[in-house]
């Protein structure tokens, strides 16, 4: 990436080659760089600042529900990982192992954490004794390693940043309540802050997390019609508790197993932001997540008083995340650069504007230009940012709804998947064989059984037997 030509060169059209468009945007918006290890990326300031804002927003929401942050080691002894059979089998192909340390072979291999259930379970088994110790509501921000065969920045990398919450409860009801609570927290965050509408639902048994009783998911639809799993919340029941002997003494002085949950979100969300809102000029960031909400571009900045006025304007706009671009680049270059980086509002101000006590505001998403009095500029920018946030969500929801189809037969299902990228709603009998057959024949996977169930047919779209659930299907990242 360092050897790329000019940042503001034209990027591949998303309609021509969506995958290349995505790569171009990631490169030219300077979000990440490639490292010397295949599948590992370096977060550049522009990319990491988005993740910092995601962290800040989510962390506050977690803590409002009573969650506390902790940090677990990155290494897991092999014997500990092997304690929960389904869990280890689910992750075995992706695990990275440390076999040597300090120049010597280790007596026991250490796994570089792909996820931390086993560490939290081992910890809980030592600190939970009584019902008075419950619930335990812990979260950690860290990186994990999964040895993926194919990788793409943000969407699938060997090492990625995430948060993983792990809770322990006295009853099954409390655990289920927490599982759903966190899923809804995720969905609300995505819709309110990232302006990405979500389908909330339950994964099929085939798609659920290894070792979980139930996995709930939020699914988003990208601009190219592919789905992106954007956050998951798992109810483990007492399965892990039995494997790790996590017991507590209840009020009747009887030993009981705890019921557990885990839930996580990752830097995939940045990929979702790019693919839901981006256009052929680069990123388009919703104001609430944008590291810089307003950029001031002085015109003819070497003229007397222009930079001083820009600095004065920055102070006036202190309620927003604002920067002045006083670099030596031309105004046209700066416009393209800030469009590429998705900054929501650009303020243009030059000698004639100063004389007229005005500035020009440009919205990133619609390119709409507004001439506004400097006396009212802070109010007007606030209105633009609020409108932009709301309208970006509406556009994304309209796009998703326009690309959500129904199928009532195998032939119709295959035709929709082949010719109409998007979500496909179809009834399902509940049998894994049908799920496997649909994937084999069409490449579509079950995304979720939505909480908002509909009855669009009596029979399974695959086998024709009595249907049990409506499922959202689709090709996915």
Swiss-Prot record:
Enzyme class, first EC level, given as a word: ligase
Compartments, as annotated in UniProt: Cytoplasm
Ranges that cross the membrane: none
Keyword line: Aminoacyl-tRNA synthetase, ATP-binding, Cytoplasm, Ligase, Nucleotide-binding, Protein biosynthesis
SUPFAM superfamilies: C-terminal domain of ProRS, Class II aaRS ABD-related, Class II aaRS and biotin synthetases
Protein biosynthesis found in the keyword field: yes
A Pfam family hit: tRNA-synt_2b
Family in the record: Belongs to the class-II aminoacyl-tRNA synthetase family. ProS type 3 subfamily.
UniProt-listed HAMAP family: Pro_tRNA_synth_type3 (MF_01571)
Domain notes: Consists of three domains: the N-terminal catalytic domain, the anticodon-binding domain and the C-terminal extension.
Protein name (Swiss-Prot/TrEMBL): Proline--tRNA ligase
Biological source species: Lachnoclostridium phytofermentans (strain ATCC 700394 / DSM 18823 / ISDg) (Clostridium phytofermentans)
Upper classification of the organism: Bacteria, Bacillati, Bacillota, Clostridia, Lachnospirales
């Amino acid at each position: 990436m360092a050897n790329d030509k000019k940042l503001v060169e034209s990027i591949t059209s998303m309609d021509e080659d969506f995958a290349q468009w995505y790569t171009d945007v990631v490169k030219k918006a300077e979000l990440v760089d490639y490292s010397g290890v295949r599948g590992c990326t370096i977060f550049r300031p522009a990319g990491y600042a988005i993740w910092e804002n995601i962290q800040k927003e989510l962390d506050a929401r977690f803590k409002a529900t009573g969650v506390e942050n902790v940090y677990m080691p990155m290494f897991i002894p092999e014997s500990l990982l092997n304690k929960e059979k389904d869990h280890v089998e689910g992750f075995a192909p992706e695990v990275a192992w440390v076999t040597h340390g300090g120049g010597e072979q280790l007596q026991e291999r250490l796994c570089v954490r792909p996820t931390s259930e086993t560490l939290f379970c081992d910890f809980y088994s030592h600190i939970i004794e009584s019902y008075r110790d419950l619930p335990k509501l812990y979260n950690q921000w860290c990186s994990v390693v999964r040895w993926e065969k194919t990788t793409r920045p943000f969407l699938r990398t060997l090492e990625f940043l995430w948060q993983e919450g792990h809770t322990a409860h006295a009853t099954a009801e409390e655990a289920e309540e927490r599982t759903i609570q966190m899923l809804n927290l995720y969905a609300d965050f995505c819709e309110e802050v990232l302006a990405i509408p979500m389908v909330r639902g339950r994964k099929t048994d085939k798609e659920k997390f290894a070792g979980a009783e139930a996995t709930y998911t939020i699914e988003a639809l990208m601009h190219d019609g592919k789905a992106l799993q954007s956050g998951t919340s798992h109810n483990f029941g007492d399965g892990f508790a039995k494997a790790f002997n996590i017991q507590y003494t209840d009020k009747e002085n009887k030993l009981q197993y705890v019921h557990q949950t885990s839930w996580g979100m990752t830097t995939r969300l940045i990929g979702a932001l790019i693919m839901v809102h981006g256009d052929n000029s680069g990123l388009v960031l919703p104001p609430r997540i944008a590291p810089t909400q307003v950029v001031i571009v002085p015109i003819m900045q070497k003229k007397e008083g222009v930079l001083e006025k820009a600095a004065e304007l920055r102070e006036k706009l202190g309620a927003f995340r604002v920067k002045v671009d006083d670099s030596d680049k031309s105004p046209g270059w700066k416009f393209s650069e800030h469009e590429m980086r998705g900054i929501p509002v650009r303020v243009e101000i030059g000698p004639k504007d100063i004389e007229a006590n005005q500035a020009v505001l440009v919205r990133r998403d619609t390119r709409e230009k507004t001439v506004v009095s400097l006396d009212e500029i802070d109010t007007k920018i606030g209105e633009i940012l609020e409108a932009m946030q709301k309208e970006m969500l509406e556009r994304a929801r309209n796009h998703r709804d326009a690309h959500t189809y129904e199928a009532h037969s195998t032939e119709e299902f295959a035709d929709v998947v082949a010719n109409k990228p998007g979500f496909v709603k179809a009834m399902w009998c509940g049998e894994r064989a049908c799920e496997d057959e649909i994937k084999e024949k069409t490449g579509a996977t079950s995304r979720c059984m939505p909480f908002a169930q509909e009855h669009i047919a009596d029979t399974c779209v695959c086998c024709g037997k009595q249907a049990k659930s409506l499922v959202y299907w689709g090709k996915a990242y």
